[in-house]
Structure formats: C-alpha cells, structure tokens
Amino acid sequence: FYLESGKWYWEVKAISKAGGGDEYMIGVAGRSASATNQPPHNAANGGIVILATTGETYATGATGVSYGVAYAAGDIIGVALDLTNSKIYWSKNGTWMNSANPAGNTGGASLPTTAALTPQGAYSPVVGFYDTPAAVFSANFGNGYFGTTAVASANVDGNGVGKMEYAVPSGYYTLNTKNLKEFG
C-alpha cells in the first residue's frame, strides 16, 4: 500500500542484527523505489528516505546527513509521516530527534517530491539493513504489540484508535485499517 495524503504515525522496534554489519534503516520508500538497487544511495532509486542506526538520514541519491542520535537493538523508533507538508520525523524511545516537533511542523526531514515518484508523493513504510546479513524488526501500526510483546503505555491517536508505546503527535493518525479507511 502507498500513502498519498495525510499525517501518519507508526513505531518500529529494532530487535537484532546478525553478523555485526553496519546499520538498520527505518523510513519510507516511493512507489518507484527498488529494494535491490542499493537503496537509498543510488540516485535512480526513487523516493527513499530512511534513518540509519548512526542517526543520519539518507534520501534518494544523497550522502548521509546528521539528524539525530544513534539507535540500536531494543530501541523503539517512532515515525511521523506528514504528506501535507512533505516531511518525515523520527523519535527514539519517545523523544523526537533533531529538536523536531511534528505537531508544530518544525524540524523534520524533507521528502522528495520529484517526478521520479509515481504518483508524486506516494510513500510506503520500509525497514531494511545495510552491510549485515540479517536484521529483525517488529512494527506496531496500532495493534498494541511488537510481535508478541505488548506495549506498556497504550497511547491512542486523536481519533481514539491505536495502542502505541509512545504518544502519537497531535494531528497524526496511527497507520491501521480503521484510520486508512476513514482518513486515507
């Protein structure tokens, strides 16, 4: 599925990585992105924006840009995708990185809105790994679990939907079927 409008929130927990490789990657990818074309470093790979374990962000064809703090296995990364203002935000264990405030539209990383995206501005959540043979992630889109582990906090969005570990930014909806049907 691809999101074309709205403000969405989900959480990803980095569980483990094998082989001691470089990094996890958490973010979004455009419809024209390729998982086999060295994302996101290749300029021909349309619309990928990710946060690496180093705390750097990478956008299609660009080198890393310092954004936040490093994260590792056990950390929960919150992702706030703002398609109204073409931005993406990340939090680590409930604290927004880079002094960002998604509810106030401050900070955040810009999303590519180039012709490479078809349709322009259509994104899907992605996780991945670079230079490591395997990585394990678990995502919470509002069901209240990371795999079989329940969240402790059960925060809901402004629509009263979802069970998230950390607070959903004001004006954002948890990325689940109920909210997609109503707001997607």
Question: How should these model regions be labeled?
Answer:
Residues 1-184:
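PRY/SPRY (B30.2) beta-sandwich protein-interaction domains
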